[in-house]
């Protein structure tokens, strides 16, 4: 009669457990390796626009000015799908006043109601509250509302600016001071397509975006449909940016556009 060692089953379990632990450690190491220092991430170059939506997004691309107490925008993801690990929420804006490889602005377009929404979103490696950094990762966005995306004489009818992860302030009365000043043939020309925004931190609230009289800077624009599959997958992963909400992800985009939709006065 064949006998079975009382330890044979245990040995089999231990072997499986060891293999499982090894696989888990490998998986964790891969996940950790996927998040890298902000200065390692290479932003996407701005491609030549080919579609109506892409051309409109370039036409209306805004300037962003950052105050001296917050971070400048960084690239959040590279072509391989690696994401930034952000920076710890401490020591003011140390380590995030200059993006070594250049900054990035992300765009996505959606028709909504009788208007077209162009969302521009920026990533920041620290989140600020009451003037102090409190945690890793922050996203801020604006939605520029266009009356007719396909028309050569299309115009901005409103702009909605993020005041939190999901809420927007909407402005329908824009004046010349809200638009960029561009130098053309030794003359300063006021744009009628490029708005000026400031990433601002003041008072008893989180940092937010507002219209400003400062010119700021342009960033390379990459549209959602121009990203690599790996980059889109990374931006769609809620685990990659802590509690910060990626406003143009597949999960969030439509809800943000709906929230930002302006009042009846401009519909």
From Swiss-Prot:
Residues forming coiled coils: none
Pfam families per UniProt: NPP1 (PF05630)
Stretch forming the signal peptide: 1-35
InterPro entries hit by this protein: NPP1
Superkingdom of the source species: Eukaryota
Cellular component GO terms held in the UniProt record: extracellular region
Domain comment as written in the entry: The structure of NLP effectors is remarkably conserved with a high level of conservation of a central region containing the conserved undecapeptide motif AIMYAWYFPKD and heptapeptide motif GHRHDWE.
Protein function: Probable secreted effector that may act as a pathogen-associated molecular pattern (PAMP) recognized by the plant immune system.
Protein name: NLP effector protein 6
Organism: Plasmopara viticola
């Amino acid at each position: 009669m064949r006998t079975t060692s009382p330890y044979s089953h245990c040995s089999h379990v231990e072997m499986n457990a060891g293999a499982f632990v090894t696989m888990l450690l490998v998986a964790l190491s891969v996940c950790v390796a996927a998040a890298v220092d902000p200065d390692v991430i290479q932003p996407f170059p701005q491609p030549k626009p080919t579609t109506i939506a892409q051309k409109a997004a370039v036409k209306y691309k805004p300037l962003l000015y950052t105050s001296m107490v917050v971070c400048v925008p960084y690239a959040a993801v590279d072509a391989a799908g690696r994401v930034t690990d952000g920076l710890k929420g401490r020591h003011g804006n140390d380590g995030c006043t200059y993006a070594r490889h250049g900054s990035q602005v992300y765009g996505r377009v959606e028709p909504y109601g009788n208007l077209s929404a162009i969302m521009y979103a920026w990533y920041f490696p620290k989140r600020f509250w009451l003037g102090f950094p409190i945690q890793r990762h922050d996203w801020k966005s604006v939605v520029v509302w266009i009356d007719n995306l396909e028309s050569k004489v299309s115009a901005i009818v409103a702009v909605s600016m993020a005041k939190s992860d999901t809420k927007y302030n909407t402005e329908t009365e824009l004046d010349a001071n809200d638009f960029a000043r561009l130098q053309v043939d030794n003359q300063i020309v006021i744009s009628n397509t490029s708005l000026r925004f400031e990433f601002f931190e003041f008072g008893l609230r989180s940092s937010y975006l507002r219209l400003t009289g400062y010119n700021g800077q342009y960033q390379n624009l990459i549209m959602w449909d121009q990203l690599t599959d790996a980059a889109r997958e990374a931006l769609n992963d809620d685990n990659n940016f802590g509690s910060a909400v990626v406003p143009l992800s597949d999960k969030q985009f439509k809800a943000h556009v709906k929230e930002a939709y302006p009042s009846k006065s401009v519909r």
